[in-house]
Amino acid sequence: MSERPGTEGRNPRAAGLASFTTREILELMNDEDQTVPAAVRRAIPAIEKAVEAIVDAIARGGHVLYVGAGTSGRLGVLDASEAPPTFGVEPELFYGIIAGGDQALRSSIEGAEDSEWEGRRDVAKAVRAHDVVVGISASGRAPYVVGGLEGGENVASKTVAITCDPSSPLARAADIAIVVEVGPEVLAGSSRLKAGTATKLVLNMLSTAAMIRSGRTRGDLMIDLRATNAKLRDRAVRMVRDVTGLDEDAARTSLEANGWSVRAALEADRQR
């Protein structure tokens, strides 16, 4: 049997879990969750390197490919899917690839993560020059993800790993290894818990910081958001109102005249 990954360890605080009350289970989970932000904080130097690589890639016309399996794959697809409405970018700028394809977003595809060859093939079909390939695997041992990183290494400008195990094959294979050591889970091996939370936090940081550094915001305002529903149109009105000093009706009129583009409305006001 191969060496047990750190994500498969037993948490001594959960040894008596079967006898815990509901309140005790919830408090233990909450206690464990509170250790995650500190673990992410320790990984910021590597996260910073990854963000700078992504910013450089985007400036050169590159894209970001997230590759994962199971929970890790779903989190990658989630982050990628939020980039267009949040930052007004094309859907391909951040692109999620998950073992087993789109069906795996809703249900478990048994064995999908076990094929290194399929990971290599799927990424090789999608990757282009100047892209950054981000492999996501809590254990760092999912063959599909390791293969995916290898599939992009000869084409992509950089490869990045997000994992919880510093000695894993994924960490060793990447140009930049983001290692968030969260320790064993309340349920041994259930990496959808702390490891999943850590992964989501890291992905938030990668895409958000990269977009800020790429000029897709104005300060803390999402001026390139796509105002496709009532909530987002109200948000757009507030942004234009707050920046320009226009009243709400004038801000809305300006947005309507500029196709509901906050950036265009602000530029129109600047030129008045």
Segments predicted by a language model, with ranges:
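Cofactor-/ligand-binding subdomain signature composed of acidic, glycine-rich
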Residues: M1-A39
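Short, positively charged patches
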Residues: E8-P12, E48-E52, H63
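Gly-rich Lys/Arg/Thr-decorated short loops/hinges at beta-loop-alpha junctions or inter-strand turns
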Residues: L28-V36, G96-R106, R218, R233
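Short, basic, glycine/proline-bearing loop/turn elements
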Residues: E32-R42, S107-S108, V132-G135
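A short, well-structured juxtamembrane/interface segment
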Residues: R42-A57
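Glycine-rich phosphate-binding loops that contact phosphosugars or nucleotide phosphates
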Residues: V64-L201, A210-S214
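Short, amphipathic alpha-helical interaction segments embedded in low-complexity terminal/linker regions
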Residues: A210-R272
